[in-house]
Amino acid sequence: MCIRDSIISEGPQYTISDVKIVGDMPLNEELIDPIIETQKDITYSQAQITQIEEIFTSLLGNEGYAFASVKGQPDIDEEMLEVDLSFVIDPGKRTYTRKILFEGNEITQDDVLRREMRQFEGAWASDDKIEQSRVRLERLGFFKEVNVETVPVPGTDDQIDVKFRVEEETTGNVGGNLGYSDFGLMIGFNLQERNFLGTGNSVGIAINKSIYQEVYNLSFYDPYFTIDGASRGYSPVSYTHLTLPTIAKV
């Protein structure tokens, strides 16, 4: 068996000496300059270019430039072991959201989903607001999965539709209890539905019964009781019936 030792040389390291923007950058300098400054005088790598491309693309997407193009171009100085980075920016047209669409909500009503939106129809399309909307749908607890995609509107170059696809899951819970004490057998039953009839409201029913006591309770919770999003919970029906045991005379 022959064993060979190999020496691998990664070559010299290059330092980023300058970073500049080429093309049309519609974002404020106060937002861009700190990003550029953090890249100077650090070791150059291709991953560094990719990271900055993604940051600029995300920032542009949050301001409505859904189809922005960002390309990093290195200018390498072999003698000085330095690299000047240029980022060529083509923001494209600012993009509007034409429609927000929902698919897969067979039970949950559209308005329950729509009130969670942070991206609005007719407004600039914002990647950040679209993602916030997706997360808020997930947090409702009505869906196994929530996915979103942006679809260019045919015949236009500045409009998109935002399409949310949801997979609903069971939102009801049934429970019960059975016990025995000095007062005899005790039976309990409870039903909780977190998305009653697809309205997003929660309804609960609880029944507890023994030989001497009966307790009935109905609860209701509306997370959007007002148009401003104020919630309200209450128990419109609560009934207790108590029967005292008879003490036999000696």
Model segments located where?
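Conserved small/polar residues in nucleotide/adenosyl-binding loops
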Residues: 1-5, 240-246
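Amphipathic, non-transmembrane alpha-helical segments in extracytoplasmic/periplasmic proteins
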Residues: 48-67, 129-146
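Short beta-strand elements
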Residues: 66-75, 144-152
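Extended beta-sheet lipid-handling architectures
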Residues: 51, 67-69, 191, 220
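Gram-negative/organellar outer-membrane beta-barrel architecture
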Residues: 107, 123-242
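Periplasmic POTRA and POTRA-like interaction domains that precede
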Residues: 4-47, 72-127, 153-188, 228
